[in-house]
Amino acid sequence: MTMLKNPSNKYRAFPAIDIPDRTWPSKAITQAPIWLSSDLRDGNQSLIEPMDAAKKMRFFKTLVQVGLKEIEVGFPSASQTDFDFVRELIEGGHIPDDVTIQVLTQAREDLITRTFESLKGAKQAIVHYYNATAPSFRRIVFNQDKAGVIQIAVNAGRIIKRLAEQNPETNWRFEYSPEIFSSTEPEFAVEVCNAVIEVFQPTPEQKLILNLPATVEAATPNVYADQIEWFCRHIDRRDSVLVSLHTHNDRGTGVAATELGLMAGADRVEGCLFGNGERTGNVDLVTVALNMYTQGVDPQLDFSDIDAVRKVVEECNQLPVHPRHPYVGDLVHTAFSGSHQDAIRKGFSQQDPNGLWEVPYLPIDPADIGRSYEAVIRVNSQSGKGGITFLLEQEYGISLPRRMQIEFSQVVQKETDRLGLEMSAKQIYALLEAEYLQATAPYTLKGHRLQEENGTSAVDVEVAADGEVIHWRGIGKGPLEALVAALPVKLEIMDYHEHAIGAGSNAKAAAYIEVRLDGERPLHGIGIDENITTASIRALFSAMNRALHQAQEAAA
């Protein structure tokens, strides 16, 4: 079978909701929602190999450490493993006083009863129940009419309320999900939820959670936002319910749907870290939270060490996080492109540590989430001088002058083309050493002595060449002019730069010099030494030897 030429014969667009006065497009997210992690339930049930008790406990503690205050810990009526885990959390005293666990149950009395058994002794808990409301599920799966669906929700609600009243030692909260909400007629979704509201009689002090799942993502995010706004306008006792979002990523827009849903009036978000979950996954709580953070909104979740969180999630889920995954992937803060690298390097050089973040191509400061700057710029055959310069500055304190950046980038480009691989900062520095710092032929500096008197410098240098030691002497207005006068070749200094590497007693000096030999094209040299004069002399020898070597190659 192949793709259809006319897919409308098989698929139809989801109907839009008519809200001519919709308000969500002009809204902004200005505060964090209530967050619930479903990693231990929705995430866990989607794994090839579900977590054992030890992994679940490790994951739970990580969620608490991140700052999650509501955590769905399992489906205890459907799994003995989940039941035992809930008991261990409660009996082992693992639940902090400010954290509420949530469990899921189907709308059946035996399963609800088993659920309450699992929660015995909990200080506080949310009982979350659901039944499917979408037309296709009513017709195909359950053969139920609308009245039958409402009756299921109401009957289950009454059982839950009764069992809660029989166990007053726990501070109970309740959540209802019209499953497949995003494919349910809006009027019917409100009708079912209003019937549930009548059962629980919520108040502004004791709110009922109405969770509105895009169980299967069926439309563009703006349609989901319209559904949420319409629901918020028409539901009874809006001040006594928390409207919760539970999006999936079947169309790849779970994050966008969640953000627009919050703009449309929702109060709460359910999801999983890094988007684990059924099929294409639940919404990624990390991405939603850090999207808020980069807009200046405190998400009230702490991802200061995002790689440690990722390590736990990968090991417990036995699934890798994609290298391009927002914020946490190995490559998301990495630039290979030369123009991108140049912009990033300039951004870092001008960034005010206490000012607004304005580094191009980086929507977040990697340091805020525990990332180093080492991986921000990586060099391959697509890279330019900006990336090379950045790595040398960050890792070795080497600040190449602009024209030298261009010259050395050609050296690196030639090497990356030869290797066909990425080059690390260490490899780039080794190339710099080989090209400039080890340019000791045909003349190797063995030593020098400088005398200065009345504004005149006299320099004596000891040089090794062709197995012999020779001496040069020159006089000039400064050490470099004196050295140029001593050289056996006609050398013209075009440019000179110097700076310190490091600080304090261990600091070294770096000198960069650009010379022209016999009127040929300019070339550069580098010298590094504890003494700035020695560094300058080494730089001149480096440039001279490189120029002589290239002249010899050209003649050959």
UniProtKB/Swiss-Prot annotation:
This enzyme's EC code(s): 2.3.3.13
Q: Identify the pathway.
A: Amino-acid biosynthesis; L-leucine biosynthesis; L-leucine from 3-methyl-2-oxobutanoate: step 1/4
Q: What does this protein do?
A: Catalyzes the condensation of the acetyl group of acetyl-CoA with 3-methyl-2-oxobutanoate (2-ketoisovalerate) to form 3-carboxy-3-hydroxy-4-methylpentanoate (2-isopropylmalate).
Chief location bin: cytoplasm
* Transmembrane domains' residue ranges: none
Q: Which cofactor does it need?
A: Mg(2+)
Pfam families membership: HMGL-like, IPMS_D2, LeuA_dimer
| Identification of the protein by name | 2-isopropylmalate synthase
Question: What are the record keywords, sorted?
Answer: Amino-acid biosynthesis, Branched-chain amino acid biosynthesis, Cytoplasm, Leucine biosynthesis, Magnesium, Metal-binding, Transferase
Task: Say which family it is in.
Answer: Belongs to the alpha-IPM synthase/homocitrate synthase family. LeuA type 2 subfamily.
Q: Which GO terms describe its biological process?
A: L-leucine biosynthetic process
Q: Where does Mg(2+) bind?
A: 42, 246, 248, 282
Which reaction equations make up its catalytic activity? 3-methyl-2-oxobutanoate + acetyl-CoA + H2O = (2S)-2-isopropylmalate + CoA + H(+)
Listed GO MF terms: 2-isopropylmalate synthase activity; acetyl-CoA C-acetyltransferase activity; magnesium ion binding
Q: How does it assemble?
A: Homodimer.
Extract the ranges annotated as region (Regulatory domain).
Answer: 439-556
